[in-house]
């Protein structure tokens, strides 16, 4: 095949979609599996960890280090029962969450790190954490989320003003030592449509002003007593709202954030969003999420920058998959997964692609994150639905780390892999006639980290030189007529 190639820029979606992958309710699932199940990468993958290095039992997970039969609520341990952040002061960057952060970035996604942290740690700890993140490109850091609540350990050991002041302190450290990182302030926002202020608004006003991103967590329905009881009608450990009410409350929160910031807007996200199948049943759960996303699409104001689906695989009923109780390495697909897959393949939630001029080789690709990347696009005319469609990365091309997209379906090529079979695209959506299709290639960092090249932009941008196009094999007939 004689092919031409053009530059292509990947920019932000009208509303970005992020995905939770691991929390107190479930373990991390590798990005190869998630990509195969959902057919596209996300803007960011949300990883949830805690940092309480001054506590007894650290760095053991709280439910292991402080195991007790008397515990009757998920947050009853001395510190938060997330997996523990192994970085920080005297940390180990070969452990969690860094192994997962590299996996996330190799697959063309940004890192969204949630960290609950003891407000009493010194600046030395905060500086170490900030430095941990400098090689991971455009990181979003959600510090002590749901900070106007009462369940997390940082709220139990500090006043709300102290929690808010700590947020501002940590934000300033991040800006000085890791300018590639954006901070997310996640508080309760407007929780009653008749409220004129947000909960603990006075305490958090300064944090609202300094943060990079505003956020609220909203579960349309939630069984917060899980896993210690069963949600039954009339019970006291769950609640149920409507998609419309939840959407209105989130939008009212955004408007109040703007008011507190002198009318100046900032990006607004919902860092945890779902309906709990424990309350609704799994089929209605899927319907509710579709309804909520329809509200996002239909709102002309487009005030929401993105949301995080909580989560991919869950031990309860808050996941696209439920963890198989017989084997935690296996996920049981829920009705929500197919509904969510349809949602994220809607153009409204997909990154915007802009084709540029024809390129000549060698060509340099730039990865500035999932919302700012420059790749190449190869137009290919197909006479009819193919029987074979393969992309070969030979010689020096085999070393590359590549994300590819054709007909809205994404594929990953890891370093040293030489052939990617594109045919799943055409099994699922066969062509009925000849058509020109486009193969897009992007090059996220080879090992998931940016290299300090000494350039001014190294914390944000990673560059990859491609010497030539990969070989494309298309056949319209079987190898033999057997």
What do these predicted regions represent?
Residues 1-34, 41-42, 49-52, 140, ...:
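Substrate-binding cleft of secreted/luminal carbohydrate-active enzymes
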Residues 18-133, 295, 299-301, 312-315:
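N-terminal carbohydrate-binding/catalytic regions of secreted carbohydrate-active enzymes
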Residues 63-64, 68-82, 91, 219-279:
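Glycoside hydrolase catalytic-domain groove-lining segments
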Residues 299-413, 434-436, 446-482:
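Aromatic-rich peripheral "rim/lid" segments of glycoside hydrolase catalytic domains that contact
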Residues 45-49, 201-246, 310-315:
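Aromatic- and acid-rich polysaccharide-binding/catalytic face
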Residues 171-199, 263-278, 304-314:
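Aromatic-lined carbohydrate-recognition surfaces of secreted/lumenal glycan-active proteins
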Residues 130-160, 184-190:
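Active-site groove signature of glycoside hydrolases
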Residues 31, 190-215, 280-284:
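Substrate-binding cleft/loops of secretory-pathway carbohydrate-active enzymes
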């Amino acid at each position: 095949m004689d092919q031409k190639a053009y530059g292509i820029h990947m920019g932000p979606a009208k509303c970005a979609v992020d995905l939770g992958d691991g929390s107190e309710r479930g373990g991390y699932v590798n990005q190869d599996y998630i990509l195969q199940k959902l057919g596209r990468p996300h803007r960011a993958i949300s990883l949830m960890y805690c940092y309480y290095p001054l506590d007894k039992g650290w760095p053991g997970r709280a439910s292991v280090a402080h195991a007790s039969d008397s515990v009757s609520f998920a947050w009853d341990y001395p510190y938060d029962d997330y997996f523990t952040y192994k970085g920080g002061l005297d940390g180990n960057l070969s452990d969690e969450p860094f192994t997962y952060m590299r996996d996330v970035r190799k697959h063309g996604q940004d890192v969204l790190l949630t960290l609950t942290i003891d407000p009493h740690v010194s600046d030395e700890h905060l500086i170490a954490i900030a430095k941990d993140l400098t090689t991971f490109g455009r990181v979003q850091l959600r510090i002590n989320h749901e900070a106007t609540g009462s369940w997390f350990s940082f709220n139990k050991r500090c006043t709300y003003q102290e929690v808010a002041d700590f947020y501002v302190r940590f934000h300033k450290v991040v800006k000085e030592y890791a300018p590639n990182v954006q901070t997310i302030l996640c508080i309760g926002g407007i929780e009653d449509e008749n409220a004129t202020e947000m909960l603990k608004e006075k305490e958090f006003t300064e944090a609202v002003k300094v943060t990079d991103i505003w956020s609220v967590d909203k579960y349309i329905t939630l069984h917060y007593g899980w896993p210690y009881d069963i949600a039954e009608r009339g019970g006291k450990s769950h609640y149920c709202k409507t998609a419309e009410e939840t959407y209105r409350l989130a939008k009212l929160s955004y408007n109040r954030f703007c008011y507190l910031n002198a009318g100046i807007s900032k990006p607004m996200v919902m860092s945890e969003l779902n309906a709990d199948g424990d309350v609704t049943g799994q089929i209605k759960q899927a319907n509710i999420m579709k309804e909520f996303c329809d509200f996002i699409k239909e709102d002309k104001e487009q005030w929401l920058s993105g949301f995080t689906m909580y989560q991919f695989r869950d031990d309860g009923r808050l996941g696209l998959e439920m963890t198989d109780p017989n084997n935690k390495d296996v996920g049981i697909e829920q009705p929500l997964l197919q509904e969510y897959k349809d949602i994220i393949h809607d153009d409204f939630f997909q990154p915007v692609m802009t084709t540029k001029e024809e390129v000549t080789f060698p060509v340099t690709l730039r990865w500035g994150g999932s919302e700012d990347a420059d790749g190449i696009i190869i137009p290919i005319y197909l006479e009819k639905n193919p029987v074979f469609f393969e992309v070969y990365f030979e010689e020096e091309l085999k070393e590359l780390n590549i994300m590819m997209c054709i007909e809205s379906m994404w594929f990953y090529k890891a370093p040293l892999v030489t052939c990617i079979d594109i045919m799943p695209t055409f099994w699922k959506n066969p062509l009925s006639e000849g058509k020109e299709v486009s193969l897009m290639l992007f090059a996220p960092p080879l090992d998931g980290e940016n290299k300090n090249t000494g350039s001014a932009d190294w914390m944000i941008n990673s560059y990859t030189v491609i010497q030539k196009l990969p070989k494309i094999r298309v056949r319209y007939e079987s190898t033999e007529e057997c």
